[in-house]
Amino acid sequence: MQETIIKRHEVMQTTRNYLVKHRFHEVEIPFLNKSTPEGARDFLVPSRINKGEFYALPQSPQTFKQILMVSGFDRYFNIIKCFRDEDLRNDRQPEFTQIDMEFSFVNQNMVIECIEGLLKEIVKTVKGIEVQTPFPRIGYDEAMERFGKDAPDTRIPFELKTISDIFTNSEFNVFKSTIANGGIIKALPVKDDGKLSRKMVDDYTVWVKTFRAG
């Protein structure tokens, strides 16, 4: 645990040094705020002075973005706690830390290059590994076509393949209606000569459902 805490400190210090070098200012924003529409429920803090009224802890740090931007802070960041009252999952918890970077008068490539540089600096400082940039990039359409999701894990060597032609004359209603309605049928090729037993397929079906798939 000590090693993890030290690495976390190194990541934060590297982040601050990098962003300050790139003309960002670190801005501290209030925790006690009004409730705003977000993706989860707010954690509420009762007000002692205003009976029956509550503050809301921030779900994301962008609440003050417009005020800061029009006040002249065209580049700022904060490393801040966020709070979301939602069901626990493997990748969800009620309190987490977020690195928030906001900057004006930039285009998409400028944003990507800035973040690539930050990640490269963090990995070099914390792990001693030199990462090559720019990172490989694929567009949304290509990602959906090849992987079926917009944020694929490219370490997984499987890609979706279109097999609609195989089922052109199929009487299986699921495939038949899909093709008739202009849809396509895709499959995920499995190596090892397709040696999957029925039990293995059933086990995989149960497993993917834990990720709310299928």
Question: Where does each model-flagged region fall?
Answer:
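Class II aminoacyl-tRNA synthetase catalytic cores and aaRS-like
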Residues: M1-G214
